[in-house]
Amino acid sequence: MAGQIDPIRAELVGWTPRVPRNLLASLPPLGRKTAPKLPQNISFSPPLSAHPCYQCQEKCLPHRRPVSWSPLILQRCRLRCLPRGHPLKISRTFELPVGERDGSHPLTAFARAPRTTEPRSLHYLYDSLPPTPALCAQLLFHQLIQGHFSFVVHPTVATAPRSIWPAKMSRFSTGRLLAQNLFQAFNKPVFPSATPVWTRAFSQTAARRDADSESSAKLMESLTRGIVGMAADPTDLTGDKLATNIGLRDTEDEPYHFHIYSHKHNTHITVTKPNRDALISLSCGNLGFKKSNRKHYDSAYQLGAYVVDKMHQMNLHNKIKKMEVVLRGFGPGREAVIKVLLGNEGRMLRSSIVRVSDATRLKFGGTRSKKPRRLG
């Protein structure tokens, strides 16, 4: 693999170049790893072929026939040694295959591009070119971009008109021009609109959220308006409206509560008003059961029957329209008190029960439990 693509910054990391060493010497370091160190005495010039053109007698790139450009580059130079100021038409100069004459190949789009000094896309770079050596340099640059730096989709290169080009394009000036264009291509930022989705950085996803920004703004505006309106009109926050606004249930709809707390040592029963004020609160110890006698099923059953009888004495069975039974713990008194409510003792309270809930406390982690008691 020639290089590893970093999708966050779209740059080459740990790349192994396949370009000539003299061209690699002029490239800037890319990514977080620098290019390998090369000898500094290597001059920069386009790669030359073994045989020069029979007309212009210059050794140039089109004679090499690279593998990637084999259907495009011919064996001899097609420039016909035109004068320096002659506008070149690449679509007429190069003989393209039949399947690539419809403009699909990048080289066919360079013939009618407008002349300008502004930065432009690579596909509109070759409006007019100087003769053979500069053309070799530009073609080499195009091959470098397409073959080895394919993650840059539309590199922008600043070109200049032919009037400011040197009169004689030597190998040294051609190399400097190629290096300058190459540096500008990698120094300019690659905008998200010019890159595919898979090369965008994760920090450039704001454009995808623009579609929902209007609805989010409307939601925030309505929420702010409601809060400001409540603060501006304090009369709405009094009385029953306050309970409605903060989500509290009306106390008139709250039922009475019949709490049964049973653990392995005792059983507690508490009857409360809707506002949580206690009416009756008794345990097995209040009935005369001492020590270990408080944990048995019979003591809990007697406690339940006593509490129900006391509720009848207080005429609570006529006052209570709604009652909630709240169970807590898994001791033997749990089933005993339920038997009382379902039996003959609780026949006058059974019809007022509207809800049965369990309030047993469960630890998720929590404090450390007591060590188990072991006898013997």
Swiss-Prot record:
Alphabetic keyword roster: Mitochondrion, Ribonucleoprotein, Ribosomal protein
Molecular functions per Gene Ontology: structural constituent of ribosome
Pfam family of the protein (one): Ribosomal_S11
UniProt-listed GO biological process terms: translation
Gene3D superfamilies cross-referenced by the UniProt entry: Ribosomal protein S11 (3.30.420.80)
Source superkingdom: Eukaryota
Keyword presence, Mitochondrion: yes
Family: Belongs to the universal ribosomal protein uS11 family.
Task of the protein: Component of the mitochondrial ribosome (mitoribosome), a dedicated translation machinery responsible for the synthesis of mitochondrial genome-encoded proteins, including at least some of the essential transmembrane subunits of the mitochondrial respiratory chain. The mitoribosomes are attached to the mitochondrial inner membrane and translation products are cotranslationally integrated into the membrane.
Quaternary structure, from the entry: Component of the mitochondrial small ribosomal subunit (mt-SSU). Mature N.crassa 74S mitochondrial ribosomes consist of a small (37S) and a large (54S) subunit. The 37S small subunit contains a 16S ribosomal RNA (16S mt-rRNA) and 32 different proteins. The 54S large subunit contains a 23S rRNA (23S mt-rRNA) and 42 different proteins.
Record protein name field: Small ribosomal subunit protein uS11m
Source organism per UniProt: Neurospora crassa (strain ATCC 24698 / 74-OR23-1A / CBS 708.71 / DSM 1257 / FGSC 987)
Organismal lineage: Eukaryota, Fungi, Dikarya, Ascomycota, Pezizomycotina
